[in-house]
């Protein structure tokens, strides 16, 4: 029987060409890119080449591309930076947001007195755009909206 994978919102199979390149790099260019020895410099060149390639695809500067270890670290960096650097005072989200976001939002509320507004979701796991507009209109401070576009646990698409 042929298997079919339907959970691509959670994790997606790596393309064969990407996997081949990753294996080659991990076998032959495994130096710490922060080190000054030859292996480290070689790894740094590979990383910076990848950064430039991605930046070109998105028409941004390479310095705007940040590599992280995964989704949780990415969520934490964005949320913490929004509060500390951009002076966001209100975050609008939902109770079904990814736990990494919800945990950081809770932390920001407790430690930085950020106001959190939770939008209601319907029985399909979607928000009302009217509710979002009302929440935005009720805020007199800098605001960040964080909403999961595709929920891999319940299958909703917002």
Task: Describe the function of each predicted region.
Residues 1-158:
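Pyridoxal 5′-phosphate
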């Amino acid at each position: 029987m042929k298997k079919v994978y339907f959970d691509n919102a959670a994790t997606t199979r790596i393309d064969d060409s990407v996997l081949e390149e990753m294996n080659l790099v991990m076998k032959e260019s495994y130096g710490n890119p922060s080190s000054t020895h030859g292996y480290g410099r070689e790894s740094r060149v590979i990383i910076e080449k990848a950064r430039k390639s991605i930046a070109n695809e998105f028409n941004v500067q390479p310095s705007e591309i940040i590599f992280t270890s995964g989704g949780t670290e990415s969520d934490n960096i964005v949320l913490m930076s929004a509060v500390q650097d951009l002076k966001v005072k209100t975050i609008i989200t939902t109770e079904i947001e990814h736990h990494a976001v919800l945990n950081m939002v809770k932390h920001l509320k407790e430690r930085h007195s950020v106001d959190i507004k939770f939008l209601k979701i319907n029985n399909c796991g979607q928000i009302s755009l009217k509710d979002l507009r009302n929440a935005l209109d009720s805020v007199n401070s800098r605001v960040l909206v964080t909403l999961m576009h595709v929920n891999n646990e319940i299958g909703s698409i917002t």
